[in-house]
């Protein structure tokens, strides 16, 4: 999110966190960056190999915060880049409410559900006090991820770097449970 409300310390911390992630990509990783405000802007037209990270870090450091917040368009563009043959993590960061394009939370959820690969994992970070927690929580829960929230006085860069260290080398993926006919009532997290 590079909308105008991100300007200042929040945006600087987001840039630092993204710099950390880019500098810690695994050799076989592929990535892209989609910034959004009134419109969207991509680092590249398609996913790039990890050895492009240095160039991407320079690109990120040149970004500026301005404009409104088009969450729907950013999510749909990101979903369109997914390679169904590989596990995909989407890290989504915003400080606000959708104010541009599609702004209805239910429509955004429906649009993304229709566009996202079933294997996409969405991790959401909400920054500040004026965040659509219903939308962000629903997006994360519906796409095998999690949501985290940061207050303006908290260190976003530290939270994101800790988070990335946790997901960059997954121990288990594609888990499934077979209860062999047993009746179950609760499963957490759901979906697994």
List the predicted regions and their residue ranges:
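Exposed acidic/Ser/Thr-rich ligand/metal-binding surfaces
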Residues: 2-192
